[in-house]
Structure formats: structure tokens, C-alpha cells
UniProtKB/Swiss-Prot annotation:
<protein>
    <recommendedName>
        <fullName>Uncharacterized 42.1 kDa protein in intracellular alkaline protease 3'region</fullName>
    </recommendedName>
</protein>
<dbReference type="InterPro" id="IPR032713">
    <property type="entry name" value="EmrE"/>
</dbReference>
<dbReference type="Pfam" id="PF13536">
    <property type="entry name" value="EmrE"/>
</dbReference>
Amino acid sequence: MFRGAVMKAMLLGILAAFFFSFTFLLNRMMEVEGGSWLFSASMRFLFMLPFLLVIVYIRTGFKALWLSVRKNPFPWFGWSFVGFVLFYAPLTFASGYAPGWLVAGTFQLTIVAGLLLSPLFYHVSADGSRIRQTIPLRSLFSSAVIFVGVVFIQAQHATSISGNLLFSVAPVIVAAFAYPLGNIKMMELTDGCIDTFSRVLGMTVMTTPVWVVLFAIGTIQHGLPTTSQTGQALIVAISSGIIATLLFFYATDRTRKKPNHLLPGRSTQSGEGRVRTHIGASLFASIVSFSTCASRHWTYCHWHGASQLPHTENSTAKFGKSEAKQEWLTLVLEKFWTRQIQAKNPNAVRTFPISLSDFGDSCKPHLAVFFAEMKSWDK
């Protein structure tokens, strides 16, 4: 039962990662085309608002959300500001100083951040008392090793942009800590009284004044955004802001609302708190790892004009010395492909599509199976 609950949460996180990866790609494209990060950040959430209003109105209405916000207006605004503004504004700002794959790679710090923030969170014991969570040292060590490996691999690229290093790394570090902190604190604040859709809507509404101010500043400094940037911001709002955020928040809600799925029946409350931390770290890891792979592969194919990565007869990618370091995550995916796909079908042909449409088409069969599996989860 425990493995099933973990896998369900992980699958939701991986699916969220697919849609979240659009953020790093399109934010960088908007910056390269001359668009201001102020517009990239603000328009995403301004575009999210009407979609969320319609979804929540159809599903549950606004009464429960209104009662929750009216009960704790200042905590609602504070943690919404942390989870949305301090998360996304720094990410878009950093896109102006570093390529998308480097931003996505640096954002992997959120794996470690989610563990370091554990003492700030509580879980409720059987007698109703609040118990502070502890940092899971084993998970922290393994996650730290992963992050240090990423730092070493990207070090040569960091030296080439040393002048912009502070503006590309520091904001992403802020975002890496703000995202899990704001999300989990809002879960504690609402305590299950509203669903995921209402919670995301409430956080969006509470931060709307901030996004309006950022949009106004951008208009004063640069004029109105271009049609291209507006369209790209709309895509980010739907794919990353609506779909990915809701999937990820729903995944964390599933593990929180059903503690009996986290451990066998004899588990303790403290054990459940640790497992929630492990699952949260795994979800963050799936998002940023997938995003890094997508960004790196898009960058490689964009600059090298390749419709698929070069490979030898034994399906091992053949790169130069420096490129092999840059494409290490793609090699991980290839190893998975070789073991899982080619083992079942020796005649399968390995291809890596570069366009978003081709990428989506290649994922359709897998997504169809995934959604079919989702329908059976609540039965």
C-alpha cells in the first residue's frame, strides 16, 4: 500500500514536471527576444486568474475559500507572497542572465531546500498535539551529493558567465527555498478545509496586486509587451501555472490527507512526517530533473540543428568531452530507454524530438496510460 501511494504521488509529480519544463524554455526565449522579466512574471499569474475563477466556480464555488481567507487574511497573503512571488519573480529575473538549462539546473537546490526547511513544519499526533518535524539526515546527504554533482558539472559554464553569476544564481536560490516553504505552509494554514484548486486560486488572488504593480512598472519602463511575449506568457500560464501547479499541489495534498498510505499500519506519527518530507523531496526532484533534461536537450538541438542525438550502434550517445558533461542527464534518460523500452522491443528506434509538438506527440501514448491509471486511483 505504501509503494502504491508513493508511486501515485511520484507519477503526478513527473507529469507536473512535463508541463513545468515549459517555464524555463519560454522564459529564456522571451528574454532573448527582448521581453522584460516583469511582464513574463506578472502575465503568467494574471492569465491564470480567469481560468482558476471558472474552475473553482464550477467545482465548489467560492464560499469555503472566502471563509478561509477572511479567517486568516495576513497569513494568507504572507505565505502566498512567499510561495508565488518570491518563487516565480526571481526565476524570471534569472532568465535574463543565464540560459534556461542553467536556471533549471540551479533550481535543483529545491531538493535540498525542502529537507532543510523540515523543522519549520509540524504534524499533528494522535492526541492532537503539534510535533515539529526533523531533518532526515540520510535524505539530506543523498540529495546534497546530487546537488554537488550538478555544481561540478556546470562549473565550467559558470566561469564563462562569471560577471552575471550573482544575478543568475542568487535569485534561483531564493526561488528554490520559497516554493516548498510557501506551498507547505499554505497546506498547514488551510488544513484541508479547501481543495487544491481553491488554494491555488486564493494564492493567486492574494498576490494579484503585486503582479499588477510589476506589470505597471514594466509598462512604464518598456511600454506594453509584444504580441509574441503575451502569447508565450499565456502558454506558460496554462502549462506551468495551471496544469503543473495543480498537479503538484494535488500530489502533495494526496500524501498529506491520507497518512495511512504513507507507512504500514504500525507506523508512528513522526514516521509519517518523515515520509511526507521524503515524498516532497522526490516530487521536487522529478520536476527540476525533467525540466533540466528538457532545457538541455532543446538547447543542444537548437544550436546543433539535430533532429535526434547522435548515437552508435549500441545506442550510446557519442559526444565530445565537454558536450558529454553537458548532456549527462540525457544519457540517464537514454539508459532508462535502453533498459525499459528496447528490452521489450529490440527493434525499437530511439529518437529524441526537438519541437514541442513532436515532444507532445511522442508522450501521448504514455499520458493516455497514465490518465487511465489515474481514473482507478479513487475507486
